[in-house]
């Protein structure tokens, strides 16, 4: 079998790489042992534009969020599934310093952080004496649906080898890799 690309692992990276290679008409083989506790299989799939205790915007968020939204929706449409949804984060401040940090970002007109209008809305469910804020948009990639549906497509296209990758079997010469 002659292929252009060998992909090791069908996590979210292997899924996207195989998807885009397929769209470009490239040949590939994806090798995956379907390890049930692989990071992509146990991940919540959260795409959050804000990170850390200082509530800073993640690198390239303005580019990545629209791209991710469009890409997941396109792939979901092609597979006949819902691959992504928006679920904003309510950030309950554990102490006064976290509130100050968050509100400082709100005052700086941070693109993704907002004061939550009803500071008492969740008091019947949670104990939070320092208030809360909202981060939006935050996306959830439906990996629990996407990964198995894409895996089935790989099987149908005979581009998936379900086994452990053994690097010792890889033979690299100056003219080819087999």
Regions found by a protein language model. Name each.
Residues 1-4, 174:
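Short, Lys/Arg-enriched, disordered terminal segments
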């Amino acid at each position: 079998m002659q292929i252009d690309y060998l992909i090791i692992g069908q996590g979210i990276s292997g899924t996207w790489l195989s998807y885009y290679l397929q769209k470009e008409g490239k040949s590939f083989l994806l090798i995956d042992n379907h390890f049930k506790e692989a990071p992509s299989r146990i991940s919540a799939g959260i795409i959050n534009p804000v990170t850390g205790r200082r509530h800073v915007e993640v690198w390239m968020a303005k580019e990545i969020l629209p791209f991710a939204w469009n890409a997941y929706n396109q792939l979901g449409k092609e597979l006949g599934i819902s691959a992504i949804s928006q679920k904003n984060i309510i950030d309950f401040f554990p102490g006064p310093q976290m509130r100050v940090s968050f509100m400082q970002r709100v005052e700086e007109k941070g693109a993704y952080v907002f004061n939550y209008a009803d500071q008492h809305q969740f008091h019947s469910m949670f104990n939070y004496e320092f208030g809360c804020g909202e981060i939006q948009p935050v996306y959830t990639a439906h990996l629990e649906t996407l990964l198995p549906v894409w895996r089935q497509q790989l099987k149908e296209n005979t581009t998936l080898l379900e086994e452990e990758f053994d690097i010792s079997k890889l033979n690299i010469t100056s003219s080819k890799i087999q």
